[in-house]
Each structure stands twice: as C-alpha cells, then as structure tokens.
Regions:
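Solvent-exposed, conformationally flexible loop/turn segments
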Residues: 150-154, 260-271
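Catalytic-domain carbohydrate-binding cleft regions of carbohydrate-active enzymes
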Residues: 1-154, 158
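A generic structural signal for beta-strand entry/edge sites
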Residues: 129-131, 154, 224-228, 266-268
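Solvent-exposed beta-hairpin/edge-strand motifs
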Residues: 132-144, 245-264
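Accessory, solvent-exposed terminal regions and/or long lumenal/extracellular loops of proteins
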Residues: 159-260, 270-271
Length: 271
C-alpha cells in the first residue's frame, strides 16, 4: 500500500527495501520479497549494518534461483518500465497503480491491497495473495522466462486484453542494448484489436530535450486466423538499433503465437 499511495501522491519512483532495511530476514521472507519487489518501480535490495546478509545468494541455492528468475523478468520488462517512466514524467501517472485503475466504477477493487497494476497493461499478483479482487475483461496469464510459473515464490503475471507491451532481452546491466531484439507482447481484446507504445532515448543525459528520443505507437488487428501488427506512429529524432525489426508474440488462452519481421511493413502472425 505504501508504494501505491506514493504513486497516487505524485512520487512514481518508490519501492520498499527488498529483504527489509531493519532486523534479520530469513529465506522465506526474502524469496517472497524479491519475487514481488522485482516489479517495484524502484527495485533494490538494501539493509542496515548489523543485520544478516541479504544478498540473493546469502539464503541458499533455492532463493538464489528465485532471485535470478525474478530479476530476469525485470530486465525483460525494462522497455515497458522505461516507457512508463516517460509517461510518469510527462503526465504524473503512477507506474505502480492500484487495481481500481482498471475499472474505477467497480467498487470491489477499491479494497485490493496486494495485487497491483504496472501501467495499464500488466497485472502483478504476489504469491502470498491467496484471494484477490481482479478487474473484469480479458487478462491472460503471462510467462516471461523458464521457471517463472514454478515454485511457491514467483508472482503471477497477467497481460490485459487490448494491449501491446514492449519487452527486451535478458541483460546483465542497463547499459547493454535491451532492444536487440525488440519483442512485442500482444493480447487482443474482445474486438480482436490491441495497441501500445514504446519510449526510448540515450538512457542518460539531457539530449532527449532536443528531440533525441523515439516514441513509437503500435497497433494489432485480427482478420480471420491472422493478426497484423504494425508501427503506426513515431515522434522524435532518434533511430533505434533494431531498424524496425521485431519479434511479435500473440498471447492467447491456447498458447503463444510467434512471428518476426519489420514493423514498418507489418508483421503477420498466424493463429
């Protein structure tokens, strides 16, 4: 609730110290915390002097593997988070959002304090949240890396119908090129359509203020047993390294359908 409230108060970059700043943490606490904390806007492990070690490897092989999977999910989602950071800086919208943002008229969502939204399109359900109030509509289960649906710690992810989420690859630090390749996760709504955007710039400095950025808009539309995904708009002077090339994954109840190509020309995915 603290991070959700901070977001609503105009402070989008927030997140509790993973493992807890004070007092000792055990393996079970840390496993649950890092699996959830990987989705905080501001995600870091931190501890006070005099407490036990709280590095991911300090709790044994199981928690080290839990931590690896959680952080790989985070790295894959960096293009989405970066886009949300741009939105927060220009509109004030929080990155981590209460569930009721998905449907403000549904009063049953107002009391939900465990599950939360990242942006409009990604729903995060912590492993310890046994009963959650979920928004109506299409929300498909989402797997990002091998093993992220196994065990008792990893948070469950759902992608909203009607959305396109930009993702990257597993990297070791944020200075590496996350967009080689760019992967778009597509989940169609009841009308067989979806849309999304991606913001990217140099990652440091102030050149974006002079137009050194790229803000791209994507659409997807189903026609029969095929889905066409296109780049439909772009602002900014920055040319991305992927040159319009991308992988598209259409998320359905029956599984993932995949294709690759150039977004400027359109990428067709068979269902």
């Amino acid at each position: 609730p603290m991070s959700l409230t901070l977001g609503l108060s105009g402070q989008p970059m927030s997140g509790a110290d993973i493992g807890g700043f004070l007092f000792h943490a055990d393996a079970d606490l840390f496993g649950n915390w890092i699996a959830l904390g990987a989705f905080y806007p501001f995600s870091r492990g931190h501890a006070c002097a005099g407490t036990n070690n709280k590095e991911p490897w300090a709790f044994g092989k199981e928690i080290e593997e839990v931590s690896r999977i959680a952080l790989e999910r985070r790295y894959i989602l960096l293009p989405y988070y970066y886009t949300l950071l741009h939105e927060a800086s220009t509109t004030g919208m929080p990155i981590m959002r209460p569930i009721f943002f998905a449907d403000p008229k549904d009063l049953s969502l107002r009391a939900e304090e465990k599950a939360f939204l990242v942006g409009d399109d990604l729903l995060v359900i912590p492993s310890f949240a046994k009963k959650t109030a979920l928004p109506k509509g299409i929300w498909e289960d989402l797997s990002l890396v091998d093993g992220d649906k196994d065990g008792k710690y990893q948070a469950k992810l759902k992608i909203r119908g009607g959305s396109i989420i930009p993702t990257g690859k597993i990297i070791q630090n944020t200075t590496e090129n996350s967009l080689d390749p760019l992967t778009l996760l597509v989940c169609l709504d009841e009308q067989g359509k979806a849309s999304g955007s991606m913001y990217w710039d140099a990652g440091d400095g102030w050149s974006y203020q002079k137009g050194d950025y790229s803000l791209q808009q994507f659409t997807a539309e189903r026609n029969g047993n095929k889905v066409m995904v296109k780049l439909v708009g772009k602002t900014g002077k920055r040319e991305l390294e992927n040159k319009g090339m991308a992988i598209v994954k259409v998320i359905t109840k029956q599984g993932i359908r995949l294709a690759s190509g150039n977004l400027t020309e359109g990428i067709e995915v068979g269902l």
